[in-house]
C-alpha cells in the first residue's frame, strides 16, 4: 500500500455520509435521526499505535498495513465500490472524491442490502397486486458495527404503497412477539388419554420434553386408544353389516310370502283351467259322435234317393219300344232246355213265314233251319205240333 498517512486517516475517519446521512434515511422513509458514528476501541488502539509510530518519525513497515487494516475492517463490510448497473437499491454507488485516493469503505451488511432490494421490488409490484402489507425481517450478523441502522429505525411491516412512503413511521411499528417465532412446546392431552394415564397412575408434565419412560407410557396409552377406536369401528361396521343383512332377510321373506300367495292363486287358476279343459273335451266328444251319426244318416238318405231316382233316368227308356211288326227273329244258340210245346209251334210258324218271305236263293238258310230242327231231334207231325228239346244259351 502506497497510501500516505493523512490520506489513510481521512479515508477511515470519514463517516459514510452516502448511505446513512439524513437525506438517505429520509429517502428510505426512516423517520429517525441519523446515527452517530462512534469510534470503537479497536479503532482507538489502532490510531494510538499509528500516532505513536508517527511521533517516532518512522513510517509503516511492510506487515503493518495488513495488521492495521485487520483492526478496522470487518470482512462482512468490505465490498466492491462499483455496483452493477441493473441494481435497484440505489445505494451501491458513491460520489467519487478526486482528491482522495480510492480506499475501502464500510457499508451495510449483505442482509441489509437484500432488504433494501426487496423494498424496490415491492415498489415495482404495487400496480399488479394492490395495496397489501407484507412482512420484512431484518437480520444482522453476530458482528454489528455501531454505525449501522439503530433499532428505532428497524421495521417489521412494509405496505406496498411505495409512492407515498416505503417504510412506516417508528411509532406505528408493532413488535413481533417471541411466542410466534418459537414452536409450541406445550403437551396437549385428550380426556381419554388423561383418564388412561390416571388409571396407570402416571402424571405427565404439561411441557415438553418428556423422559423416555413418560414417552413409553404416553405411546402405550395412545396405542390403547387407537386399538379401542379400531375395535369400535370394526364392531360398528359389523353391526351395520348385520343390520343390512337382517333388513335384506326381512325384505326377502316378505317378497317370498307375496310370491307364495301368487303361486297359490296361480294353482287355483290352473285347476279351474283344467276343469274347463275337461268340460270342453267332453263337449267335443259328444259333438263329434253326433256329427258322425248325422253324416251317416245323410249318406244313407242320399244313397236311397239315388236308387229311387236313377232308374227313371235309365238310358233304356230313351229308346222307342220295338213293335211286333218290326221284330225279326234270329237264330240264337241257347243253352236253356225248353220243354213247352208252344215254343215249337211258334218256331215252326216263324220258319214258314221266313221261307215265304225269303227269295228262292235262300235255301241254305232254310236248310240250315231244318237241319237245326233235325239236330234238335224234332220230327214233323201231320198235325203241325212238334215236341223237341232245345238247348240254348242265354245272353
UniProtKB/Swiss-Prot annotation:
Gene3D superfamilies: 1.20.5.170. Residues 219-248 are annotated as: Basic motif. The keyword Ligase does not apply. SMART domains: BRLZ. Residues 317-395 are lumenal. It comes from the Eukaryota. SUPFAM superfamilies: Leucine zipper domain. The keyword Transcription regulation applies. It holds the Pfam family bZIP_1. Residues 1-295 are cytoplasmic. According to PubMed:11830526, exclusively expressed in the prostate. Expressed in breast and prostate cancer cell lines. Expressed in prostatic luminal epithelial cells (at protein level). Expression is significantly more abundant in prostate cancer than in benign prostatic tissue (prostatic hyperplasia). According to PubMed:12111373, also expressed in brain, pancreas and skeletal muscle, and at lower levels in small intestine, testis, leukocyte and thymus. One of its GO terms (molecular function) is sequence-specific double-stranded DNA binding. Residues 82-108, 355-395 are annotated as: Disordered. Induction: By androgens. Its main location: endoplasmic reticulum. Keywords: Activator, DNA-binding, Endoplasmic reticulum, Glycoprotein, Golgi apparatus, Membrane, Nucleus, Signal-anchor, Transcription, Transcription regulation, Transmembrane, Transmembrane helix, Unfolded protein response. It is found in: Endoplasmic reticulum membrane; Golgi apparatus membrane. Transcriptional activator that may play a role in the unfolded protein response. Binds to the UPR element (UPRE) but not to CRE element. Preferentially binds DNA with to the consensus sequence 5'-T[GT]ACGT[GA][GT]-3' and has transcriptional activation activity from UPRE. Binds to NF-kappa-B site and has transcriptional activation activity from NF-kappa-B-containing regulatory elements. Belongs to the bZIP family. ATF subfamily. Binds DNA as a dimer. This is Cyclic AMP-responsive element-binding protein 3-like protein 4. It comes from Homo sapiens. The gene is CREB3L4.
